Amino acid sequence: MNDLLPAAAAPAGARALPLRHADPEIWRAVDAERQRQMHSIELIASENFVSQAVLDAQGSVMTNKYAEGYPGRRYYGGCRHVDVAERAAIERARRLFGCEYANVQPHSGSQANQAVYLALLAPGDRILGLDLKAGGHLTHGARVNLSGKWFEALSYGVDPVSHRIDMDEVERTARRERPRLIIAGGSAYARVPDFARFRAIADATGALFVADMAHYAGLVAGGAFPSPVPFAHVTTTTTHKTLRGPRGGMILTDDADIARRIDAAVFPGLQGGPLMHVIAAKAVALGEALQPGFRAYARAVIDNARALCARLAEGGLSIVSGGTDCHLGVVDLRPWGLAGNAAERALEEAGITVNKNAVPGDAASPAVTSGIRVGSAACTSRGMGPAEFRQIGDLVLAVLGGLRDGGQAGGRDAVPARAAELSRRFPLPY
């Protein structure tokens, strides 16, 4: 009879059941995903494996607490313990990135960017960001995104030969169009942006300079990648990806007036109650990034990405910009006559997860694309090094070579077992 009672009327013991018994369908999905992560090679550049401590914080009782407002200035009672977590996250972010101000409440990187726009722009203002096909992000002015609908969005690109940001084009466009805000950063750009020149261009044209370091925040935290924080008026980031925390966003600045405007934009302007369980997990991840070992991790991420890209290039694949300075690489599949979506499917069937990705000058639709993006952060977290990433490169080459040759290439059928064996040697902690 108890299974017919509404949840509120069910015996207290029923609500204490572990997921496996309380909801077998969802438990099976969660366990299947755990098994997939355990036994496959994860090369999606925006993904990583968090620690057990981050999982514990995110799955804690802090999910029960509403806490609109900021520490010490809440609109609900009973917030003294969640205030501890949020204050810790703020202070750790400030220490890690050397800034005066941090807002840790954005639910995502996209909402962090939206909060900056809400704080600093008016509808119809001009913004200037990296073109999506050149490695930019949807929230930097893509027409399908709010940023491309509410603002007059302009874009800059990359040099057609080097595939590096054409800073002269950025300057010409900024001087001609006078944008209110210039954005540096992206989701598939593998080189170090010239943050100092971006700021100089912004200053010369009366623009605000925003750096979106969502992809390389962990590398910045580990001292392996130049920091945009000293140059940007505002820096946004996610807390996952290379920072290896829970999925979420964060906003950093040294400007007190901008900080006040951002606080008001995040709450009450854009969001209501913060996700306190996620903020607690952010604090844990930021604390982990402050440990000496994280610097070695950040350096290893870049070394491994370079090893992977070099092996793919040796095997005949075209790497956009000729290599990488960070955790990701973009592979142009056009010389091999392959589509990104087909490559993504074939690799997933072999136990290797990537994502299809546009390449500079791509004529294919976003659902197809002419490239794939690969990343090293997740498998580096498992303990893999350059030798393993060269092996991964060999597996990718075998799959894509077989796809190019109509499935006839020798060795392709052996890839799933080899990928599973490599994963088995570097298990996850959960």
Swiss-Prot record:
PROSITE patterns: SHMT. It catalyses: (6R)-5,10-methylene-5,6,7,8-tetrahydrofolate + glycine + H2O = (6S)-5,6,7,8-tetrahydrofolate + L-serine. GO terms for biological process: glycine biosynthetic process from serine; tetrahydrofolate interconversion. The modification N6-(pyridoxal phosphate)lysine is found at K241. The lineage of its organism: Bacteria, Pseudomonadati, Pseudomonadota, Betaproteobacteria, Burkholderiales. It holds the Pfam family SHMT. It is an enzyme of class 2 (transferase). The gene is glyA1. This is Serine hydroxymethyltransferase 1. It comes from Bordetella parapertussis (strain 12822 / ATCC BAA-587 / NCTC 13253). Its cofactor is pyridoxal 5'-phosphate. The record marks H240 as: Plays an important role in substrate specificity. InterPro entries: PyrdxlP-dep_Trfase, PyrdxlP-dep_Trfase_major, PyrdxlP-dep_Trfase_small, Ser_HO-MeTrfase, Ser_HO-MeTrfase-like, Ser_HO-MeTrfase_PLP_BS, SHMT-like_dom. It is found in: Cytoplasm.
